[in-house]
Amino acid sequence: MADLPTPLTNLKIQYTKIFINNEWHDSVSGKKFPVLNPATEEQICLIEEGDKADVDKAVKAARQAFQIGSPWRTMDASERGRLLYKLADLIERDRLLLATMESLNAGKLFPNAYLMDLGGCIKTLRYCAGWADKIQGRTMPMDGDFFCYTRHEPVGVCGQIIPWNFPLVMLIWKIGPALSCGNTVIVKPAEQTPLTALHVASLIKEAGFPPGVVNIVPGYGPTAGAAISSHMDIDKVAFTGSTEVGKLIKEAAGKSNLKRVTLELGGKSPCIVFADADLDNAVEFAHQGVFYHQGQCCIAASRLFVEESIYDEFVRRSVERAKKYVLGNPLAPEVNQGPQIDKEQYNKILDLIESGKKEGAKLECGGGPWGNKGYFIQPTVFSNVTDEMRIAKEEIFGPVQQIMKFKSLDDVIKRANNTTYGLSAGIFTKDLDKAVTVSSALQAGTVWVNCYSVVSAQVPFGGFKMSGNGRELGEYGLQQYTEVKTVTVKISQKNS
């Protein structure tokens, strides 16, 4: 933490308009919407509210930028990579400003925003930049006198809908691979957290991306988001958010032009701690797995299964750890838990906490709101949780840990998989055979062994079942932004 700077004070929000064709636009409707600080419930600024008419403008710009012969389509792939490297450099230059803005707007702890979010964004962009001139097809020795090869071509115009829990990280996860592969994009940031995306829009222009390649339309899901999902001239939509909204997006994509869809959705991830695990390590990773960013993570370790013989000690240590939190302004250095994102999420979490109490779980600590302003909830730990309770089945998205007990390996695998979700899972054991056996059996897109929430640009991320379709990051994530074209050429004579 020695390299951590002090957050900016008196931050001025410079960019509040819609970004289309490298220019700033007022909304067609003339409407604006407020952006709040969740720690104080006070208004930060007003943002231009995009809707269908603004999405139409953005799609027109993106389609024009994607036309055959355009500067973007004729640009060398290595030059696309250079632009992405330049964007990463500019984000690094503005790292302190963006981290302060993310903390103010999204309630993120400033150290996490600066070190983890901004650090991850910069690394991911540079990873994607390096791929730009390495996206290759193949030649195939087909039967007959033919020469056959494949091209991996950009999908086209991509709509990208960003969540509020990791606004800047998810923006980069979306635009990095899409631009590396040569697509153009229309981004809709979450209405709660549009500020960092709009600042990055200014950096897109500064980096030298041609007009129309990146367009950012802030607005609400039922209007701007729905317009993207159902648009007849958008070729692909990528969404990170709730499973409920993901279903609507996939339905709209199917009913419109059958556009390609990538979804990274909800989770109720199991974390299994065997009796032979390093207990200190397991307690800390399981704790961070559910309390990081106030529990507002799709991969949260929200179903914690602990082997019976170590259960009581694990609960004791987990409660002791949760009680160490200092709540308050996420920009303050002594604070290590900030607010939930908004009133709706705050009320939902408190309702689920009350359901845990009513259904018979043992409240070990926390269990209610904190403070007299802002959307703060006490770090909460439940023990004696059973599988049929709401807190064991529903995605809470808050600082609530529920600890369940198990007796056998077969039993815990069955219980861990007994969910509609399949985003991630964790296993803690010193037994390699057990780790391999259980990781193979769990229905999850990512399984961590003796760690949790370890995510990197090089590694694919995505879910099984109702946690989504497709993958982000890594080479697998790049594949989601290309179409494979087969080209077969008749030749006079084939030679091997």
Swiss-Prot record:
Signal peptide: none annotated. NAD(+) binds at residues 162-165, 188-191, 221-222, 241-242, 264-266, 344-348, 395-397. The modification Phosphoserine is found at residue 408. The N-terminus is blocked most probably by acetylation. The keyword Ligase does not apply. The modification N6-acetyllysine is found at residues 86, 123, 247, 348, 362, 405, 414, 430, 490. The active site is at residues 264, 298. GO terms for biological process: cellular detoxification of aldehyde; fructosamine catabolic process; gamma-aminobutyric acid biosynthetic process; maintenance of lens transparency; retinoid metabolic process; retinol metabolic process. Its EC number is 1.2.1.19, 1.2.1.28, 1.2.1.3, 1.2.1.36. The record marks 165 as: Transition state stabilizer. Cytosolic dehydrogenase that catalyzes the irreversible oxidation of a wide range of aldehydes to their corresponding carboxylic acid. Functions downstream of retinol dehydrogenases and catalyzes the oxidation of retinaldehyde into retinoic acid, the second step in the oxidation of retinol/vitamin A into retinoic acid. This pathway is crucial to control the levels of retinol and retinoic acid, two important molecules which excess can be teratogenic and cytotoxic. This is Aldehyde dehydrogenase 1A1.
